[in-house]
Amino acid sequence: MKRILITGAAGFLGSHLCDRFIKEGYYVIGMDNLITGDLKNIEHLFKLEHFEFYHHDITKFVHIPGDLDYILHFASPASPIDYLKIPIQTLKVGSLGTHNLLGLARVKKARILIASTSEVYGDPLVHPQTEEYYGNVNTIGPRGVYDEAKRFQESITMAYHTFHGVETRIVRIFNTYGPRMRLNDGRVIPAFIGQALRGEDLTIFGDGMQTRSFCYVDDQVEGIFRLLHSDYVYPVNIGNPDEITIKDFAEEIIKLTGTNQKVVYHPLPVNDPLQRQPDTTKAKELLGWEAKVSRSEGMKITYDYFRSLSKEELSKEEHKDFSSYIK
């Protein structure tokens, strides 16, 4: 039985990856420091014979006994509301954490896939974004701690591949959504749905003409699964190229939820990208992958998930107390 380590296992995407690899017959070792992750996302796996969990911070030395075939590195604060509060921890996860896991992969002779992001393109001047685009980023801006952590992560991963022969894969993840997203993580989908369910006005930052492309989590997981098992070592975009303005998306949410909220506008945060759309040509050609789930279908599933939350969860403003991690 193949053994796989998944870091960030208690997070939104990490937990779905645990589900997929369990389903595929792997022995899954989950690891998470639970800064932003939630054990509720994986509690259904604890009773399984082929799953184990380590509560551990990957910026510290990582040891896994026994053989290891694959590593998926998905540990990192990923929403602005998190990495603006714990910027140094975010940088350490992308640097020290990635270094530790690459070292583990080298020792175990395991293939490692790291989760990069569309944020490496910054506020892009090229549209849609291909993997060859170098990006338009601000290293010292408010989003820089996340963007640069991921850019460094890609660099050290390729260095380990080139100089140590480590089997590496890099996925650049575009906006992904679905069940288990945190309602209060500051991203547009849970923000809009949460506001609608609480009877609040929907908040748009800027004029609403900025665009995003939303990929349903099952499609994202399928792309990651295929990339891990491919022979391609360079970055690959995985996302849904179906682009929409935030203003139009807000109207879709109002229609989906059957509410009559107003839309209110606030200033656009510094360095917030105005356009974000993946060029997925490589994913199609190399992996035979493309997004299958339409936004209307995926949003219906996601809305039903959020609607099932308790009133207490819907009204909760803060996910975690980060004070012990501010170093």
Please describe what each predicted stretch is.
Residues 39-42, 154, 190, 247, ...:
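Short, surface-exposed alpha-helical segments at coil->helix boundaries
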Residues 127-128, 183-191:
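A glycine/serine/threonine-rich, flexible loop-to-helix segment
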